[in-house]
Amino acid sequence: MFITERLLALADIPYRDFTAKLIPTIDKKRIIGVRTPAMRSLAKELLKQQPKEAMTFLEKLPHYYYEENNLHAFIIAQLKDFEKVIQYTTQFLPYIDNWATCDTFAPKIFLKYPDEVLSYVLKWLKSNETYTVRYAIGVL
């Protein structure tokens, strides 16, 4: 896939090794080693220059690489349509499998709709998925 190739081109092996130590729950083979600012820039670029590819990427779950999940979160966070952000967030939450992806995922649009977000947070808090609950607590 084009987006995965873009991430692989940004690989930094020493950074991958560092990241693997921070997130021992993820197999090192699933970590490319892309720095967060580069992933955020790629998310913005994809939404601006290749929006169809970006939206198709959001529909393809699960992802294999840790960075694919982070990029997924960063793309969602850039969306301007509250309903779409909620839709994609709800679809994505069960696939979050580590603290780092969970804690970096913060759609700014949530700040504009606190009451609406709270109703979703209350649902997410009831989840059996560890990182869905962690995410809900972080949103609060």
Residue map of PLM features:
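Alpha-helical scaffold domains
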Residues: 1-140
